[in-house]
Each structure stands twice: as C-alpha cells, then as structure tokens.
UniProtKB/Swiss-Prot annotation:
Signal peptide: none annotated. Residues 178-214, 326-338, 922-937 have a biased composition (Polar residues). Possibly exists as a homodimer, homotrimer or a homotetramer. Interacts with F-actin, protein phosphatase 1 (PP1), neurabin-2, TGN38 and p70-S6K. Residues 598-1091 are annotated as: Interaction with TGN38. It is found in: Cytoplasm, Cytoskeleton; Synapse, Synaptosome. This is Neurabin-1. The modification Phosphoserine is found at S192, S338, S372, S461, S841, S916, S929, S957, S958, S961, S975. Keywords: Actin-binding, Coiled coil, Cytoplasm, Cytoskeleton, Developmental protein, Differentiation, Neurogenesis, Phosphoprotein, Synapse, Synaptosome. Interacts with p70-S6K via its PDZ domain. The PP1 binding region is natively unstructured, upon PP1 binding, it acquires structure, blocks a substrate-binding site, and restricts PP1 phosphatase specificity to a subset of substrates. Residues 989-1052 form the SAM domain. Residues 1-144 are annotated as: Actin-binding. The gene is Ppp1r9a. One of its GO terms (cellular component) is neuromuscular junction. Gene3D superfamilies: 2.30.42.10, Transcription Factor, Ets-1.
C-alpha cells in the first residue's frame, strides 16, 4: 500500500531535477483547481488533501514516529515540557510541506466533523510524576504528536462504511473515490490494513465510561487526528478513586448519527443529513447499556448529542471527485480529571442547547470534575470495507494499522493527587493550536569548558540549540553537469523506455461510472517512490467507457492524460489526475511492440492473482467469524451500537487484562455514597468486560488452532500427493533406465557382430593378398621358363640351319659329281640335256620322271647316284600356316574370360610367341632347297602344336587362380553365362549383355532403367555420376561400384589396344623380313639356274 511521506522529508532523500520541477508545477495547477469553491457554495477542503501531492512513495506513520522518538531520546524532561508549551501555535496555517495522514477520521452526513473527547489514556499520562529520562521523553513526545494533529483532521472527508457480507467483500482503495470516479481509482497492491483486528477489550472499557459521564470537556471548533495509538502499562493496585482513568483506545464516533434517541433530542442538526445506516457490532455480554438506569443512558445520549452541534459549520461532507480522501485516526486532546463526588445531574444542562453549553464547557475546562468519556473506536473500531457507491452512513469505524505502540512509564501510587495540578496546567493552553511552521527541537549545546584561554576574544554559548524544521519556498535548481542523468533521474530512464513503446492517442467520454479502468504503478520501490516502470492499466471495468471503446487494454502504459505526463510520477499523482478529468478525456497510451516479452504483464498478472487469493482468504475469514457471531449471538442491538465500539475478531489482538483490587470487606449500600456505588459498579463491569475479552481471545485462539489444523491437514494431503507423484515418477524413470540398459545390450551385441564380420573380412583380405602374390610369383616363373624354352628353340634352329647348309653343300657336290660322271659318259650327255630342256623349272619335274630317266640313262654309277638322290628330300610346295594360326586363335578365344590384366598379357604373349615361332619356322622353309623341305616341315610341325599347348596351360592356371580369388572375396561369383556373354569386347556389348553385367554386380533393380534407355557397351563406357543419377541410381555406393568397374574395363581396353598395335607392328616387321627373304631366294634360285645352265 502506498504510504504517506512529508515533502520535507522527501527533499532530503532526492534533490530537485528539471523533470521533477515540471511535475510539481503541473500538480500545483491541479491543486489550485481543488481549492476553488464549487458553484453551489460548498467549500472544498484544502487541508484535507494533505497540502500538495508529494511525488514519491509515501512513508508510513511508523517511520515518522520512530524518527521523532529518536530525536527526543536525549532531551531532559524539563526541556521537553517547555517544547510542548512553545510549539503550540495560535492559528492553523497550512504549510506547503504539511504531511498528509491517510488515517481514520469521522464525518457526519450533514457536513460537520465530530470533535472527539479526550481519552482515559491521555488523562492518565498527566499523572506521571517520575520523570525518568528516555521513558518520559517517549511519553511526552507521544502526547505532543496527539496535540500536533489537531489542525489536520477536521476537514478530511470519508464515506461511511457498511457491514460487509460474507463472500461480498471488496477492499476499497486508499483514496475513497465517489461513484463518478470509481472506475478510475488506483488499485492497491496489498490489502488494506483496515480489515485487521484490534483488541475488543478497550472498546468495552470505554463503553462503560460512556454510559454515565458527561462530555463536558470539549473545546468548540477542534477536531484532531493522531497517527498513533498509545497504551500505558499501569500498576495493578489502583485506588478506587482512579479506576476510571484506566488506559483505553480512543475511537471515532459520530455522536449525531444515532438511529433513535439523537433524532429526538437534537434540534440543530441540518436537514440534509442522511439516514443513519447501522453498523453491526459485536457486543459483549453483560455490558449492554440496557442494564444501566434509563435516566443515565438517556442523559449520556443527550449529552453526547449536544457535543457535536457547535462543530457543525467547521467542515462539509461533500466529497469532491478529484480530491483523495485520507484515512486518519483521531485521538482526543482535551484533558480533564473525573472526580467521583461530582453529581451526575450537572450533565443534564447539556441537553438545553448550545447557548447553555458554552459556559459549562469553559467551567469544565478550567476546573471541571466530570470525566470526559471518549468514543473508543479510534484504534479498535471495526473496520468495514467501503462500498464505493455508498454515500450515506452514520458511523465510521476505521483504523489504519493494527499494531499498538505502547509507551511505558512508571507511576506512583499517589498519582491521582498530583495529576490535578498537571491537568490544570495543561488545560490552560488547550485552545492553542499547534503550528507546524514553528516546530523545532532542542539538542544539547556545547559542554562547559574547564579552562578558557586568556587570549580568546570570543565566547561560546552552552545553551541548548534549537533546530527548526524549515521549508523551502523555492526549489533548489541543481546545475551539476557532472551528474549522470541516467543515474540521477528516474524520469530519464522512463522517457527512454517510453520511446521504445508504440504510442497512440485515445479519447474517452467520462460517464457517470468513470473511465472504466483501474491503474497500478509498477516500480522497484527503493527510490523515493518514483514508479520505475510507469503507470499501467491494471483492469478494465466490464461495461465501462474503456471497454466500450476497446482501444485501451490491460497492461497498457498511460503516458499522458489531458496533456499531463504520467511518466515518472507516483500512483497517487496519477490517480489524482484521473479523478480530476471531466467530459472528453484525451489519453496517450503506450503499448509494447508485438514479439517483446512484457515484464509488466507478468507483474500485473501476479498482482491480480495475489489480490484474488487474499480476497478469497478475507471472504473465508469474514464468513467464519460471522458464523461464530451468529452461533454465540454476540451482535449488539442498534441501541447498543452507539455506546459499544465495534469489534472485529481475528488477527493479532492486544488485550490488556487488568486485575482490579477487590476489597476484602463488603460494604453495604448504606455505607457508600452514590459515587462509590457507581465506581464499584464500574469496577465490576470492567472485570466482566475483561473476562469477556479473555473468552473472546480464547475463542479466537481456538479458531486459529483449528485453522492451523486444517492447514496442516491440507499440507499433509499435499505432501502425500507429492510422494505419490514422486513414486510414479521414480517408476517411470526406472522403466526408462531398464529400457536404456536393454538398448545398450543390443548395441553391444551389434558391435560384437560387426567386429566379428570385420575380422572375417580382414582374414579373407589377407588370404586374397597372399594368393595374388603367389600368382604373381608363378607368372614370373612361367616367364622365365618361357625364355629358357625360346633360347632352346633358337639353338635347335641354328643347329638345323647348319645342318641344312651342310646338306646343301653336299647336294651341290653330288650334283657336280653327277655332272662330271655324265660328261665322262658321252653316250648319256644328250639324254641329260633333253631332260634339262624338257623341265622348265626344278619344281615342274616330278619324282617319278626323274627316277625313270635316271634308271634308263644311268650307266655304271647308277646305283650310287640313286642312293644319293633318295637321301635328298624331294622339293615340295610350302605349307600354308594360316589354318594353324586361325585354329590357335580360336582355341584361345573359346577360353577367353573378362579382359583382366594378367589374362590379356597371357593371351597376347602366347599369341605373339605362336606367330613368331611359326614365322621363324617358315622362314627357314623359304631358305630350304627342295631337298631340305622335309626337315623344315618336321621342325615346323613339331614346334607349332607345342605353342598352343603352352598358352592353354597358362590360361588354365590363370583361370583357376582367379576363380579362387572370386570365391574368396566376392559375395556372388560370376556365372559361366556371364563370362561367356562378356567374351566380346566391352564396346561391342549389346543392351542384353549390359543387363547381364548389371545382374552380375547385384544391381538387378537398375536393369529395367538401363534397358529402357537402350544402354549399349559404348554408352556404358561413357556414363558418369550425373548420368547414373539420371538413370535412377540414387545410392552412392552403387554408383561408386559401377564407376570402379567401368574404369577397370576402360583400362583393360586401353591395354588391349596398345597390345594390338604392338602386334601389328611386329607382323609388319615379319612381313618385311619375309619379303626380303623371298627376294634373296629368288636371287639365289636365279643364280643356281644360271650356274646350272652354263656348264
């Protein structure tokens, strides 16, 4: 709740700034409108508004009280007494720094303010004869505070409350606005302390005194407030004369608003006074005024009615819509002693009227003996939350704080005798009003110096130093450029925050229900009350002006109202500005931009939730105690409500239990006079009231214990529910943990399987590497053996060549011998010539003709010549080797596998070896003569079948090793059909062969796409990654496999092409050699023929 703070104290906390000066100027303009009289002549209460609105958070009464007590701690009793007399002024000027006390006060519906009477506690305080330092200073300071508030209470306005029904409680805001501005009243963030409970005892005690005593000691025109309740502690052995001076709390009581008797006895009440609304009060059993004599009760009622008549013109009850009403707590000021011997009949003169009342009051003030009863609801009255629509009401029972501050002091047993002198001394200046402008305090002066220097020319005074509370008429303009504006001015921060908001104007028409919004000031709270976040819309009243307009929403910031900025102001200031608006109201609303996290919205929602919970608790609280009151029947009648203060059970109650002394001797009524009998009766009433209070306190404690028990049961149930939830959560977590364990076991199993597979693959890989090495070694061995065989063949060919040459030489020798023999035999020369002529060439002579001619013509040497000729090989045609070559190539092609590097090398080398051997053999045959062809043919026929056999063994060995590797490494081996389909070159493959190749690679899913695109061998070799993706091969592993195979095939084709080119070159060389040999042979044959023809 916002608390009051004097502007003088505020200026000591925060220095002035240009922003603050601007706001103060605006508020002064508002204040001037409050002070103007209304057109109908009703005067607005200037003092009631607590001077100007002090910007900043208000401090409560406790702060000021404690501060003032500390200031008085070190003062002497005589100095304190002097201060009390000096600081009372004659007038009531309103200081611009006068504090506003939002405490309780009372008003009448006709506009007059009740003048309250002095309380018993104040009368008792005058008999303090033991002036003991700090305790006396505290007590006198408290009295001074009672007197100080006299000029501030009379003009404050307040609505009369009604009894709040259970379930319908609505806490009223601090500023009780009228119906027209109810919608714009500022919302409070905490419950009003008016709903707290106070002790029922003191109100019952004061009700006892109120029955028969006269309200004579009343000063006209005075109505004073106090922020503090003071309870004294008194000795237990009280003499019977002074029992009536027991401490009690003063209560606010409107004596002119009684429902029955005051309307008949009062002649000067104004006609516009509204009908009284009875407030139900808890009456204590046995203390009803009905038990008193009717004369005394009528006398007390009439006497109290007359009390407030002269005070009627002091103030009016009209509540201006723009003026916040403060709650104040009135304490009595006039102090008189009651003397038991004064007859009660003197009080009847008060019934006559105000003319006879004034002299009697002067008499009672100067030396009156009657005790002035105090209405005891000032601190313990039952506070009922106000209905904002309620203007009428007769009684106002309010208090602002349930804490009771006790001022402790010691008393002598004879305080009743010495108190009269102080009473008279204090009453002498009772009509002097306290003037806050003249307030000062004295502090201890300089100590006496023991030795004063002789040459000192000045002298220091040792008198007490007076410290006056000064007020500045002009704000101190601080021009300090070194101060950081961000750190020194909260307004600067707020203006920076407003710049980030989305601002838009809104105009509302204020109707009879107000603006339809409630505001809340969101702030940090440690910086003299400036709302660090600004003034925000807390709620929007259903059906109000703001809801009908629809533009203002909850959590919006009110930046400006009718040109008055609400940036950096207090909630009270904002509420005052809103209440002062009329007609068409212009707003500037700030709203946070979309997407931002609003801390204000969170705070407001938390505040609303807290208020809702507190309201529910309060409703249950009232419902519970209303039920208790209905059961026990402790409600008082309408007649008793005026004398007995309302009591709100529950809460912390400061119950003072007085153990009154009882005389052992019982006096008869004849031995006692009327005053003693009255005193004895009051003593018994007090005892009864105390007993009732104790019973009520025990009931309250019992109810609190039951509530605590219920709360414990709820907590126990909540804890049990939490335990069950935790158990369920633990079961869930345990199930999750078990699932995680099983998952870990599964993953471990998979890992072990993967490791075993990896080890198996590694073994296969090592075995394959070993086989490859073995194969390479065998290949090297085969090459070496082949080289050795080739050398052997060359040596054999050389031996054959030498042998052939020897044979040719021998043949020539034999032919020469034959020719010689023929010459010798002249008879056969012609026959030999005919034979040579008939034969055109040596190849045309057949074997049979030669042999016949030889047998016919031969003579003596015929047998030897025929033997030589038979040894010679007859000349035959050269054998055709093309058939053998074709046969060898076909045998190789039939066993042809995929063109791997080793197989291609084997096939090429075997073919080369074959051709070279054939060609060499036939070259030899070309050089042979007709007689040597048989040997050449034999050598050629013997070498030719040998070479294909070697190549076949090589191919077989290669096939076996590669098949073993395929079986070891590949998961799916190549089928014979697949191998046969690839016997052709890759670029010659058809679409079907490409499909077979894909099936061999376990890529069956892509066969349809390849077939649809008609991918042949040439297109297959041209495929890359993008084309494979286009063909639907999305798997990167499949694409990598196909690319790898295509790369290997391309490399194999390139090597085959190079080998083919090499073979072509070798064949070309062989052809050239054959041609050269043919030329040589032809030349040799020509030479031979020429030589044979010459002889």
């Amino acid at each position: 709740m916002l608390k009051a703070e004097s502007s003088g104290e505020r200026t000591t906390l925060r220095s002035a700034s240009p922003h603050r000066n601007a706001y103060r100027t605006e508020f002064q303009a508002l204040k001037s409108t409050f002070d103007k009289p209304k057109p109908d002549g009703e005067q607005k209460t200037k003092e009631g508004e607590g001077s100007q609105q002090s910007r900043g958070r208000k401090y409560g009464s406790n702060v000021n009280r404690i501060k003032n007590l500390f200031m008085q701690m070190g003062m002497e009793p005589n100095e304190n007494a002097a201060i009390i007399a000096k600081t009372r002024g004659k007038g009531r000027p309103s200081s611009p720094q006068k504090r506003m006390k939002p405490k309780e006060f009372v008003e009448k519906t006709d506009g007059s303010v009740v003048k309250l009477e002095s309380s018993v506690s104040e009368r008792i305080s005058r008999f303090d004869t033991m002036h003991d330092g700090p305790s006396y200073a505290k007590f006198t300071e408290t009295r001074k505070m009672f007197e100080r508030s006299g000029h501030e209470s009379g003009q404050n306005n307040r609505h009369s409350p009604k009894k709040e029904k259970a379930g319908e409680a609505e806490p009223q805001d601090e500023w009780g606005g009228s119906k027209s501005n109810r919608g714009s009243s500022d919302s409070l963030d905490s419950l009003s302390p008016r709903t707290e409970a106070v002790s029922p005892t003191v109100s019952q005690l004061s009700a006892v005194f109120e029955n028969s005593e006269s309200p004579g000691a009343i000063t006209p025109g005075k109505a004073e407030n106090s922020n503090y309740s003071v309870t004294g502690h008194y000795p237990l052995n009280l003499p019977s004369v002074t029992v009536t001076n027991l401490d009690t709390f003063g209560r606010l009581k409107d004596s002119n608003s009684r429902p029955s008797s005051n309307k008949q006895a009062t002649d000067t009440e104004e006609p516009e006074k509204s009908e009284a609304v009875p407030v139900p009060e808890v009456a204590q059993k046995g203390t009803s005024l009905a038990s008193l004599p009717s004369e005394e009760r009528q006398l007390s009622t009439e006497a109290e009615d007359v009390t407030a008549q002269p005070d009627t013109p002091d103030s009016t009850d009209k509540d201006s819509p723009g003026e916040p009403s403060a709650e104040s707590q009135a304490m009595p000021k006039s102090n008189t002693l009651s003397r038991p011997k004064e007859p009660l009949e003197d009080a009847e003169a008060n019934v006559v009227g105000s003319e006879a009342e004034q002299p009697q009051r002067r008499d009672l003030t100067g030396g009156g003996d009657l005790t002035s009863p105090d209405a005891s609801a000032s601190s313990c009255g039952k506070e009922v939350p106000e209905d904002s629509n309620s203007f009428e009401g007769s009684h106002v029972y309010m208090h602002s704080d349930y804490n009771v501050y006790r001022v402790r002091s010691r008393y002598n047993s004879d305080w009743g005798e010495t108190g009269t002198e102080q009473d008279e001394g204090d009453d002498s200046d009772e009509n002097n009003y306290y003037q806050p402008d003249m307030e000062y305090s004295e502090i201890v002066g300089l100590p006496q110096e023991e030795e004063i220097p002789a040459n000192r020319k000045i002298k220091f005074s040792c008198a007490p130093i007076k410290v006056f509370n000064t007020y500045s008429n002009e704000d101190y303009d601080r021009r300090n450029d070194d101060v950081d504006p961000v750190a020194a001015s909260a307004e600067y921060e707020l203006e920076k925050r407003v710049e980030k908001l989305e601002l838009f104007p809104v105009e509302l028409e204020k109707d009879e229900d107000g603006l339809g919004i409630s505001i809340i000031g969101m702030g940090v709270g440690a910086d003299a009350g400036l709302e660090k976040l600004g003034i925000f819309v807390k709620t929007v009243t259903e059906g109000g002006a703001a809801q009908r307009d629809g533009r203002i929403q909850v959590n919006d910031q009110i930046v400006e109202v009718d040109g008055i900025s609400l940036v950096g102001v207090t909630q009270n200031f904002a509420a005052t500005v809103l209440r002062n608006t009329k007609g068409n109201v212009r707003f500037v609303i700030g709203r946070e931009k979309p997407g931002q996290v609003s801390e204000v919205a969170q705070l407001i929602s938390q505040t609303l939730e807290q208020e809702r919970r507190q309201r529910e608790l309060l409703e249950r609280h009232y419902a519970q105690y209303d039920a208790d009151d209905d059961e026990t029947g402790e409600y008082a009648t309408d007649e008793e409500e005026d004398e007995v203060g309302p009591i709100l059970p529950g809460g912390d109650m400061a119950i003072e239990v007085f153990e009154l002394p009882e005389n052992e001797d019982m006096f008869s009524p004849s031995d006692l006079d009327t005053s003693k009998l009255s005193h004895k009766f009051k003593e018994l009433q007090i005892k009864h009231a105390v007993t009732e209070a104790e019973i009520q306190k025990l009931k309250t404690k019992l109810q609190a214990a039951e509530n605590e028990k219920v709360r414990w049961e709820l907590e126990k149930n909540q804890l049990q529910q939490n335990i069950e939830e935790n158990k369920e959560r633990m079961v869930k977590l345990e199930s999750y943990w078990i699932e995680a364990q099983t998952l870990c076991h599964t993953v471990n199993e998979h890992l072990k399987e993967t490791q075993s597979q990896y080890q198996a693959l590694e073994k296969k890989y090592n075995k394959a590497k070993k086989l490859i090495k073995d194969f390479q070694q065998k290949e090297l061995d085969f090459i070496r053996r082949q080289e050795v065989e080739r050398k052997k063949l060359e040596e054999v060919e050389k031996a054959h060549l030498v042998e052939v040459q020897g044979l040719q030489v021998r043949i020539r020798d034999l032919e020469a011998e034959v020719f010689r023999l023929l010459k010798q035999n002249g008879t056969q020369v012609n026959n030999n010539n005919n034979i040579f002529e008939r034969r055109p060439s040596p190849g045309e002579v057949s074997k049979g003709d030669t042999m016949e001619n030889v047998e016919v013509k031969q003579t003596s040497c015929q047998d030897g010549l025929s033997q030589d000729l038979n040894e010679a090989v007859p000349e035959t045609e050269r054998l055709d080797s093309k058939a053998l070559k074709t046969r060898a190539q076909l045998s190789v092609k039939n066993r042809r596998q995929r063109p791997t590097r080793t197989r291609l090398y084997d096939s090429v080398s075997s073919t080369d070896g074959e051709d070279s051997l054939e060609r060499k053999n036939f070259t030899f045959n070309d050089d042979f003569s007709p007689s040597s062809t048989s040997s050449a043919d034999l050598s050629g026929l013997g070498a030719e079948p040998k070479t294909p056999g070697l190549s076949q063994s090589l191919a077989l060995s290669s096939d076996e090793s590669l098949d073993m590797i395929d079986d070891e490494i590949l998961d799916d081996g190549q089928s014979p059909k697949h191998t046969q389909s690839q016997s052709r070159a890759v670029h010659e493959w058809s679409v079907q062969q490409v499909s077979h190749w894909l099936v061999g690679l376990s890529l069956d899913q892509y066969v349809s796409e390849f077939s649809a695109q008609n991918i042949s061998g040439e297109q297959l070799l041209q495929l890359d990654g993008n084309k494979l993706k286009a063909l639907g091969m999305t798997s990167s592993q499949d694409r990598a496999l196909v690319k790898k195979k295509l790369k290997e095939m391309k490399m194999s084709l390139e090597k085959a092409r190079k080998a083919q080119e090499k073979m072509e070159k070798q064949r070309e060389k062989l052809r050239r050699k054959e041609q050269e040999q043919m030329q040589r042979k032809s030349k040799k044959s020509e030479k031979m023929t020429s030589t044979t023809e010459q002889p």
